[in-house]
Amino acid sequence: MKDRFELVSKYQPQGDQPKAIEKLVKGIQEGKKHQTLLGATGTGKTFTVSNLIKEVNKPTLVIAHNKTLAGQLYSEFKEFFPNNAVEYFVSYYDYYQPEAYVPQTDTFIEKDASINDEIDKLRHSATSALFERRDVIIIASVSCIYGLGSPEEYREMVVSLRTEMEIERNELLRKLVDIQYARNDIDFQRGTFRVRGDVVEIFPASRDEHCVRVEFFGDEIERIREVDALTGEILGDRDHVAIFPASHFVTRAEKMEKAIQNIEKELEEQLKVMHENGKLLEAQRLEQRTRYDLEMMREMGFCSGIENYSRHLTLRPPGSTPYTLLDYFPDDFMIVVDESHVTIPQVRGMFNGDQARKQVLVDHGFRLPSALDNRPLRFEEFEKHMHNIVYVSATPGPYEIEHTDEMVEQIIRPTGLLDPLIDVRPIEGQIDDLIGEIQARIERNERVLVTTLTKKMSEDLTDYLKEIGIKVNYLHSEIKTLERIEIIRDLRLGKYDVLVGINLLREGLDIPEVSLVAILDADKEGFLRSERSLIQTIGRAARNAEGRVIMYADKITKSMEIAINETKRRREQQERFNEEHGITPKTINKEIRDVIRATVAAEDKAEYKTKAAPKLSKMTKKERQKVVEQMEHEMKEAAKALDFERAAELRDLLLELKAEG
């Protein structure tokens, strides 16, 4: 079993990286539960975390707040650890519409999803790696706190094959069917097997190119080979191979029988309650749907939406904690939370959103109450898995600050780059002033980011700049992740000189060519101009030796003051370090990478379908109040998660609603 991490890099830790690595390693050795790496933009936080992983040598889970960011981290860690198991675990849905019911219009929305096969393979590769070795790093999105099958069942049902092992061919076939492999002699793909005389070929769920060929002599395995599934080329002989289940929700036959009995019992109880409350239509609907699922489970061993019965399949009591990816890790694993100021609130919010939707389904007879136990972890359940956790952020949130007694600061950049200088200029004449600044940057072949407060202002500014001949593009929330990465690439290549947007805090905007970040209406206190957002936005100009930030404002707000002072403090620290070590700041020379494959596989931005404002005139006063409250709550949550376009859209809708009401 391979169990050492090997870090491969031509760089050595520099600046204050060695100090940060030493402090974090010491903290873990001393058994500190919570630590925070407060790392300024561009200080090489991923490299620091890689060194930490190598030193403490524990299986590690890195949680990012969306698939794109997870994809970027996956490619970086893969470069640092080419000889270890770096895995990727995100939601495998390219498109996902959860089942839901709208009582007002009596509309049931069926679950509709398309599963990305590449990501499903990567998920299986991640869970199987955890059972085979200790040198595992899994980069995951928040989907790692969603329910999976039992790790004990998963481990127990692994089919282990060795050369000279005595097993009948038909018994092997039965075992493969039990772990949800399908026999398919024609279309040979992931999760299937085919039989040709005394040869059984198995295509593991965690692979996409290589299959396993098992050759029998009578009732004995004569030879096990790894074969290229497409060309048939033999890649090597194996003494032993472990075939992991093709689904994370595998259940033994005797357990399945018990689960079916429990589901039937729950169904009878729920039908009784519904009849007593006069819910006859709901009772009929529930019985019809559940009986159909039970029939499928008896005949096929699974049914559509089997995860809704996961509590029964794992024989857990009501309300108990579901199994998740975290349970597949050994007890001494380490968690790294990237961009923790966004990720932690996201983990916290998952449970409530899921329960609200499922409760409606249960109340109206679409699901049994046990479906509520197929859920993401509550935050306090997630906390129970925190043995060693490191939060990584340039602007740690309240949770991290409260739980960490001492921040590990990483302010010095290996390149000697300083935090940008900040100018505050009056709002009057801001556009003309901005155009002058843009022209100066274009002459020096540098790029500009401009952040505005509203969608309308972004659009108007973009149109105006285009009219006067400036190469500009507008980054808005409807742009898909991959398209967004391409626009950023085009900015770097010089197809555009200026990018305008509301939320310039999304991942992938660390662009060395950007020497100016302009913040319009910086004194309009609110979620778009909070101290945390401002510090993050200022960081966008910290990759260039000429980096500068201009805030257009008529007064200096509290948030502006905090952000300006923090930037000044960091800059002074960086200048001191450069003087002591004779370092001259150099703009980062970062290759313009093509979009990585894991990101392509994960291409999926959280899609928000902003509904048209509901007609308040048709609602009662109570309903009206409820809609407004819900939208205000959503707006605040979106702002907390730094998803400002969504928050701004909701804010505009709220104003519309209030005007109507």
From Swiss-Prot:
GO biological process, one term: SOS response
Domain of life: Bacteria
One Gene Ontology CC term in the entry: excinuclease repair complex
Subcellular location: Cytoplasm
Keyword Calcium recorded: no
Motif interval(s): Beta-hairpin: 92-115
GO MF annotation: an example: excinuclease ABC activity
Annotated residues for binding of ATP: 39-46
Domain notes: The beta-hairpin motif is involved in DNA binding.
UniProt subunit comment: Forms a heterotetramer with UvrA during the search for lesions. Interacts with UvrC in an incision complex.
Family indicated by similarity: Belongs to the UvrB family.
Protein's name according to its UniProt entry: UvrABC system protein B
The organism of origin for this protein: Bacillus subtilis (strain 168)
